[in-house]
Every structure is written in C-alpha cells, then in structure tokens.
Amino acid sequence: AIPHIDTFQDNGYTREEMKMVWETQKIFEDDSLLVNPTAVRIPVVYGHSEAVHIETKEKITAIDARNLLEKAEGVIVMDERKDGGYATPFVEAANTDATYVSRIREDISHDKGLNLWVVSDNIRKGAALNSIQIAEILIRDYIA
C-alpha cells in the first residue's frame, strides 16, 4: 500500500484527501462539516474501499444505522459478524452499481461515533453512472 494519493498540500494532506473534504461538504451543503480522510493506493484491479468513521450530533446505534442504510437507494448492507460476512470490492461489488456497507459498529472511542466499511465498483458507480442518475432526476422532476 502507498499511504498517499496525489500531491501533498501545505497542510500535510494530499489533494485527493482534500477533495474528499470539499466534496463531502458540498454534498451536505455544510462547509462546517468536519471530515478527516486518509487516502491510500492499494494495488487492486478495480474498486474503491473506505473505512468510514463518523460522529453524529445525537447517538445512533449500529442497529439503527443498519436499518437506515437498508432503506437507502443504491445501498446494500452486508453486515454479518463472521469471516466473509462483509463486502469486498472485487467479489460482491464487482460489476454492480450498488454501494455495499459492512462492519457497521459503534465506535468504542466516541459515544456518538460509528464505524463502517464501504465498497463499490468505481468503474460502474462513479462519475458516469452518477451523471446518468442526475440526468434522470432532472428529467423526471424538472423537464418531463
């Protein structure tokens, strides 16, 4: 594994890591949203994997988070607490448009924290598919 992607910035983070901060804040329309990423390059054929650590304003249990995620469009929860009970980018996510969420658990270091493992096929679920989905929403809600 190479512990950085893209060029280093003055603050010690890389451009890729800062893009994660800016894009997350843009999606949530909240420039005060705190994001602390570390991007690494792992030699795989394709696929994105993220260990996501979030802190919420109010405590949410892993069970409640799982229930919410199971209702989210385009998300598949694969979260069994056993070997193989989690998604990987090369097996489960390969050639699918879904984003898989696994290893949903409460953060033992922060009362209002959750930890998730998230994977997707970045060739399928990326800018191209997102553009199509945005166009479909625009046509459905604003043009048709």
Positions of predicted regions on the chain:
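Active-site-lining helix/loop region of Rossmann-like oxidoreductase modules
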Residues: A1-K71
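A broad, structure-centric signal for solvent-exposed, well-ordered loop/edge residues
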Residues: F8, I42, G84, I108-D111
